[in-house]
From Swiss-Prot:
Keywords, alphabetical: ATP-binding, Cell inner membrane, Cell membrane, Membrane, Nucleotide-binding, Sugar transport, Translocase, Transport
Keyword Membrane attached: yes
Binding site for ATP: G37, P38, S39, G40, C41, G42, K43, S44
Catalytic activity: sn-glycerol 3-phosphate(out) + ATP + H2O = sn-glycerol 3-phosphate(in) + ADP + phosphate + H(+)
GO-annotated molecular function: ABC-type glycerol-3-phosphate transporter activity; ATP binding; ATP hydrolysis activity
GO cellular component labels: ATP-binding cassette (ABC) transporter complex, substrate-binding subunit-containing
Keyword DNA repair in annotation: no
Superkingdom of origin organism: Bacteria
Subcellular location(s) per record: Cell inner membrane
Stated role: Part of the ABC transporter complex UgpBAEC involved in sn-glycerol-3-phosphate (G3P) import. Responsible for energy coupling to the transport system.
Enzyme Commission number(s) of this protein: 7.6.2.10
Main subcellular location of this protein, as a coarse class: membrane
Name under which the protein is recorded: sn-glycerol-3-phosphate import ATP-binding protein UgpC
Length: 370
C-alpha cells in the first residue's frame, strides 16, 4: 500500500524540448488513477518518471512520503505491466511469474505458494506449464499481470496494456483489471489514449495535453463539467458539438443570427464557443427548459442498434451537429428536425478554450458535487 505525490515535476531534454511542465498530482493509498491524452501529451514520460526510467529535471516525487527522485527503479518497489507483455518466450507461465522472486532469492516454497495463489487469482491454473507462444493475447496479458502481482509491489504502473488486444478482449481485460485492482487494493497509475478505458477504469482521471494537466477529477465530473474545450472534445464519443458564437446580453448569438439564452458571464461582443453533447440535443417537443430551438436538416444517419447518430446541418454553420437518437427513431436523410438546447447541458468556452462559469448554475453544480 502506498501514496504517491508529484510536486512541480518537470522534464526537459538536452535538445530543449520540455515534455512535462510542472506536474502536481497526489494519488491516495489504493487509488487507481488513469492518465489519458493524445500521442505526445507526456503521459508515457510521466509513467517512466514514476518508474525511475527517466530522470527528473525539476520537482519532487515521493512514495509514502519518501523522496525517490534519485532512487533506482529496482529500489522503488514498483511493478509495471506493458502493452507488449514483455514475457520470456523460452520460459513457462510459471517460470515467467516466478522470475523476479528467484532473482530476489525468495525461498522455493514461498515462490511455489505465490505462483499458485497468483495463478488461481488470474485463472491461469491450467496454463502454468505452457510457453507464451501457446497462449492467446488475453492469456499473455494475464501472465504479464501475474508477474507484476506476484511481487506484491507498493505501486502498479500500467503502460497501455490492452492496446494489442481485439475489442472483445479489451472489454474482458478491462473488467479483469478493475476487479483485481479493487480486490488487491494496490495504488495504481494507468496510462492510455483510449477514453473508454479511461472512463471505465478510473477512480480519478488525469487529462493531459502538451505536457500539462488539463483537468483532474472523477470521470463523470470531467465529462459533465469539462474545465476546457480540449477536455470536452477529448472525452466522449462522438465528441461534444462545438458552435462558434458571439457573446451578447443574456446569452450568445450563432453565426446565422439565432440567439441562445444563457446565463454566461462574457463581455459583449467576445468570440466564444458553445458546446453541447450529442445525447443532450433533443427534439423540441421532448425538451424542458431550452436555451434555444434550432431547425436542422439530417444529412447522414449511422444506425448503431440501441442508438442512431444523426449528422445534421444548421443553416449558416459549417460544422456538423451530431445528435444521438433512439435506435427506433424513424429519422431519415433529408428530414428536418427541430432541436432544443437544454440550458443545463450547454457549455460556453472563451477564446482561450477555458470554460465560462454560468451565473447561478456553477453554485448549484458545486452543491450537487458535495
Amino acid at each position: 500500500m502506498a501514496t504517491l505525490r508529484l510536486d512541480g515535476i518537470r522534464k526537459r531534454y538536452p535538445n530543449g524540448m520540455t515534455a512535462l511542465h510542472s506536474i502536481d498530482l497526489s494519488v491516495a493509498d489504493g487509488e487507481l488513477i488513469v492518465v489519458v491524452g493524445p500521442s505526445g501529451c507526456g503521459k508515457s514520460t510521466l509513467l517512466r518518471i514514476l518508474a525511475g526510467l527517466e530522470p527528473i529535471t525539476a520537482g519532487e516525487l515521493a512514495i509514502n512520503g519518501r523522496r525517490v527522485n534519485e532512487l533506482e527503479p529496482a529500489a522503488r518497489d514498483i511493478a509495471m505491466v506493458f502493452q507488449n507483455y514483455a514475457l520470456y518466450p523460452h520460459m513457462s507461465v510459471a517460470g515467467n511469474m516466478a522470475y523476479a522472486l528467484k532473482n530476489r532469492g525468495t525461498p522455493k516454497d514461498e515462490i511455489r505458494r505465490r505462483v499458485a495463489n497468483t495463478a488461481a487469482l488470474l485463472g491461469l491454473d491450467d496454463l502454468l506449464e505452457r510457453r507464451p507462444r501457446q497462449l492467446s493475447g488475453g492469456q499473455r496479458q494475464r501472465v504479464a499481470m501475474g508477474r507484476a502481482i506476484i511481487r506484491e509491489p507498493q505501486v502498479f504502473l500500467f503502460d497501455e496494456p490492452l492496446s494489442n488486444l481485439d475489442a472483445k478482449l479489451r472489454v474482458q481485460m478491462r473488467l479483469e483489471i478493475r476487479r483485481l485492482q479493487k480486490r488487491l487494493g494496490i495504488t495504481s497509475v494507468y496510462v492510455t489514449h483510449d477514453q473508454v478505458e479511461a472512463m471505465t477504469l478510473a477512480d480519478r482521471l488525469v487529462v493531459m495535453n502538451g505536457g500539462h494537466v488539463e483537468q483532474c477529477g472523477t470521470p463523470m465530473a470531467l465529462y459533465a463539467r469539462p474545465a476546457t474545450r480540449f477536455v470536452a472534445s477529448f472525452l466522449g464519443s462522438p465528441a461534444m458539438n462545438f458552435l462558434p458564437v458571439t457573446a451578447h446580453a443574456g446569452g450568445v448569438v450563432l453565426p446565422n443570427g439565432a440567439q441562445v439564452a444563457l446565463p454566461a458571464i462574457l463581455p459583449e461582443g467576445d468570440a466564444a464557443t458553445l458546446g453541447i453533447r450529442p445525447e443532450h440535443l433533443v427534439e423540441a417537443t421532448a425538451s424542458g427548459e431550452a436555451a434555444a430551438t434550432l431547425d436542422v436538416t439530417v444529412e447522414m444517419l449511422e444506425p448503431l442498434g440501441a442508438d442512431t447518430l444523426a449528422y445534421t446541418r444548421l443553416p449558416g454553420v459549417e460544422t456538423w451537429l451530431v445528435v444521438r437518437l433512439d435506435g427506433a427513431h424513424a429519422a431519415r436523410e433529408g428530414q428536418r428536425l427541430s432541436l432544443a438546447l437544454p440550458v443545463a447541458h450547454c457549455h460556453v468556452f472563451d477564446a482561450r478554450g477555458a470554460r465560462v462559469p454560468m451565473t447561478g448554475r456553477e453554485d448549484a453544480e458545486a452543491l450537487a458535487a458535495q
